[in-house]
A protein has these predicted regions:
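Conserved SAM-binding loop of SAM-dependent methyltransferases across substrates and taxa
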Residues: 46-61
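A short glycine-rich, Lys/Arg-flanked "PGG" loop and its adjoining helix->strand segment in the class I
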Residues: 156-168
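Extended basic-aromatic, gly/pro-enriched interface segments that bind polyanionic ligands
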Residues: 65-142, 146-150, 154, 179-180
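Conserved beta-strand signature within the Rossmann-like core of class I S-adenosyl-L-methionine
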Residues: 168-176
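Core SAM-dependent methyltransferase catalytic element
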Residues: 140, 182-201
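Short conserved AdoMet
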Residues: 34, 62, 85, 167
């Protein structure tokens, strides 16, 4: 498909601190590893989930965390790099968080990159393209509401690809609406923030 078509058909609805308990679960797991950690956010949409993790990492004194966000929608990647968000997008942040992490100009919230404790980068990528493997290995894959668009065969293919890029003891955190297939690659687990899948080695 042409890039213009991809940009039109992909759904990009999100906001900061969406499903906060799951975000906290991710951060607590990363902190427990007590070492540098690589996180993949696929799809990253307009960046709110990546930057939500980055804000929580800063507030919980997590160091050595790197986040890669990928999406097939170029407009969303551009928006991630612009770091400018609406009042609605930041409505779940408290006043102190808005003040600390954003500058407000013309009722738009400009994220202050220097306030984030971790490195965030974004790239145009289709999860079924081999360019996925250029990013190396990850400890956490954060993948919300992507599988809802795939049939069973594509879901299994996706889980196989995620397995290949996850480190030992790596985890996948899906969205609440995702129907994740059972495979030999992952074990389903439950936590306060919902469901996650741990890599079977």
């Amino acid at each position: 498909l042409k890039q213009e078509t991809m940009d039109f058909i992909t759904v990009c609805e999100t906001y900061f601190f969406r499903e906060l308990e799951q975000l906290k679960d991710v951060i607590f797991y990363i902190k427990s590893l007590d070492r540098p950690v690589n996180v993949l956010c696929a799809p990253c949409s307009s960046g709110e989930e990546v930057y939500s993790l980055a804000i929580l990492a800063s507030e919980n004194f997590v160091k050595g965390m790197n986040i890669v966000g990928i999406d097939i929608n170029k407009k969303m990647i551009d928006k991630c790099n612009e770091m400018i968000y609406s009042e609605r997008s930041v409505s779940r942040l408290n006043t102190m968080q808005k003040t600390r992490y954003f500058d407000v100009k013309d009722r738009m919230y400009h994220l202050k990159k220097e306030t984030l404790a971790c490195r965030c980068r974004f790239d145009l990528c289709n999860v079924f393209d081999d360019s996925l493997f250029k990013f190396g290995k990850f400890d956490v894959i954060f993948s919300r509401n992507m599988m809802i668009y795939f049939d069973q065969d594509f879901k299994i293919r996706l889980m196989e690809r995620f397995y290949r890029i996850l480190n030992k003891e790596g985890r996948i955190y899906p969205g609440k609406s995702d129907l994740v297939p059972e495979t030999a690659y992952f074990e389903k687990n439950f936590s306060a923030g919902g469901v996650y899948y741990s890599k079977v080695d």
